[in-house]
């Protein structure tokens, strides 16, 4: 299981005080929904108004079509225990699902969810999203990889806060022309300019899940989904009991 010591993670809440051009945001919870506590959330997204989720861990990895109102899987398929599933996204007619350390990615039919093919993937798979024109992926470093539908590399982009690379980019979502990424093991989301990689905003997500709801299995924030149909944004975490519809409000 992928675990990274928090001491090696950049504290963007501290860094955000150094650059006045980087906007700081807090969360406003609009609504909350149940979330399956067995879901070690790796990827979360909407396609045609429907929520989908990929979940990880060897022997427990799944992909599921999720009923937002109940948190239950309307449809689910599992993977061989050798695979640790990571991020997922629909681009064109394909559903793409990454694996962490197996150096493969799976492609399914986006409409039927039927398996189509397995592709070689040249790096660790962490997360993947799309801007509607290309795939955008992270390997947990400070680099974002822009890929075509066959995973051919189109460009690399280094994400930076001021002049410092921002590592551990995890769970990407393309929202209104920007790339949102939560920074693994932190309660922070960075908002990235996809043209130059500059961090333009930091979202403070501390306290989103109340401590009273924590169990021994509750893990970190990981799950950002934007529904283009209505403009709503949702957050959750690994093995969290709740999914939250949120808005961000600039800090005064």
Question: Predicted segment positions?
Answer:
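Short loop/turn segments that connect beta-strands within beta-propeller blades
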Residues: 67-71, 109-113, 148-152, 193-197, ...
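Conserved beta-strand positions in repeat-built beta-propeller and related beta-rich domains
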Residues: 53-57, 96-102, 137-141, 181-185, ...
């Amino acid at each position: 299981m992928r675990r990274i010591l928090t001491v090696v993670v950049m504290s963007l809440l501290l860094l955000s005080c150094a650059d006045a051009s980087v906007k700081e945001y807090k969360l406003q919870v609009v609504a909350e929904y149940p979330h399956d506590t067995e879901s070690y959330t790796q990827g979360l997204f909407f396609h045609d108004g429907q929520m989908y989720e990929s979940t990880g861990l060897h022997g427990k990895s799944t992909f599921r079509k999720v009923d937002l109102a109940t948190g239950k899987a309307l449809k689910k398929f599992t993977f061989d225990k050798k695979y640790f599933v990571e991020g997922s996204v629909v681009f064109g007619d394909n559903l793409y699902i990454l694996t962490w350390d197996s150096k493969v990615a799976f492609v399914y039919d986006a409409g039927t969810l039927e398996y189509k093919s397995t592709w070689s993937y040249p790096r660790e798979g962490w997360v993947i999203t799309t801007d509607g024109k290309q795939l955008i992926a992270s390997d947990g470093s400070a680099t974002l990889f822009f890929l075509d539908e066959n995973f051919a590399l189109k460009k690399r982009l280094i994400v930076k806060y001021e002049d410092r690379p921002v590592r551990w980019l995890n769970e990407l979502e393309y929202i209104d022309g920007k790339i949102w990424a939560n920074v693994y093991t932190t309660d922070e989301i960075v908002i990235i300019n996809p043209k130059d990689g500059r961090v333009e905003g930091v979202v403070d997500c501390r306290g989103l899940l109340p401590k009273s709801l924590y169990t021994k299995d509750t893990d970190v924030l990981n799950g950002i989904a934007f529904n283009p149909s209505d403009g709503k944004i949702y957050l959750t975490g690994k093995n969290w009991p709740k999914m939250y519809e949120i808005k961000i409000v600039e800090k005064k």
